[in-house]
């Protein structure tokens, strides 16, 4: 059984469907008691996964072999409430790790962000580059990374960290809060208005990676030991401007 925290979100929903299609048993953790579940995920077990509630986390981790931890505040939410960002992204990850260890989970895959390297990202970056998080979103993800690395070092659980760049693709749920992302915004404008207007700096360089590639990477991490105890940048390796 694989538990996906945040499994009804933009990326989590796509990963959940991909795992289902790959014949994994999937349990989705949600902070909501009655979430809106896309039709593609109706066969999944849905459980409460409140990152501040240790009992709900232990219940979510029962009979689970691996966890994909995606639940977090986004960049805008972190900027608006840095204290909540620390409690959810940072300490919430620690709470889930502790529940996972207590319930015998063997593998913990944490989705972090390439923004831990700095903002804006500059130069050639690899996994040996020194992290320099510059805003609350990156700072709290970096903190969570350290908790995962600590648990892995203590041999309490096998932890892996995936530092994601800009994943692009359609959501399972059209109501998902993902339409402010630049590629999604342009696609939505085209569909609704038959025109596009760029609302961000056209000179900013970005690395885009298809969500389908992210999903296949997750399967590789779950089914092999190639990234056990490791940090990996999940990116295309190609920088583009708009």
Model-derived segments and their meaning:
Residues 119, 134-160, 165, 191-192:
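Active-site Tyr-X1-5-Lys
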Residues 94-136:
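Conserved Rossmann-fold NAD(P)-dependent oxidoreductase catalytic core, especially the SDR/UDP-sugar
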